[in-house]
């Protein structure tokens, strides 16, 4: 479990999105992102795949232990939503994916994930940081 850390992030022009986690018991198995306010639709898509045993990381036999939780609300553009999602993936290394080569998610070494995140951070800082009004709030 990530603990009690939750965040709200607002940068630049605003769309609403969220980074969410799917837990089996206290184990974080999946981190994903979703644009829009209706997170229940995305949750029901995951649950349908789990029930049909089509989900790669959660089996239908574990359905009673499955918990869906919003980890971070993002009020920004798509780039920031992806950045926050990659940050959570890098920090908590769920089974679903690892950061490698930008938007390509695949199994990789932890050092590859860290290097990709550092490159993304540098790109973010150089191209966007100076021109944005930033509000970042951690909620416990």
Specify the residue positions occupied by each region the protein language model found.
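Nuclease-adjacent, charged terminal/linker segments that flank catalytic cores
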Residues: 139-140
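Structure-specific nucleic-acid interaction/processing domains
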Residues: 1-136
């Amino acid at each position: 479990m990530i603990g009690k850390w939750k965040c709200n992030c607002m940068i630049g022009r605003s769309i609403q999105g969220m980074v969410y986690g799917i837990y089996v018991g206290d184990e974080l198995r999946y981190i994903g992102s979703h644009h829009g306010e209706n997170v229940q639709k995305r949750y029901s898509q995951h649950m349908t795949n789990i029930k049909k045993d089509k989900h790669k990381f959660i089996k239908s036999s574990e359905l009673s232990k499955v918990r869906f939780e919003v980890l971070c609300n993002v009020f920004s553009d798509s780039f920031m939503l992806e950045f926050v999602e990659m940050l959570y993936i890098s920090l908590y290394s769920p089974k679903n994916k690892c950061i490698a080569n930008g938007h390509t998610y695949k199994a990789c070494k932890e050092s590859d994930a860290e290097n990709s995140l550092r490159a993304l951070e540098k790109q973010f800082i150089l191209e966007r940081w100076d021109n944005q009004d930033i509000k970042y709030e951690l909620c416990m």
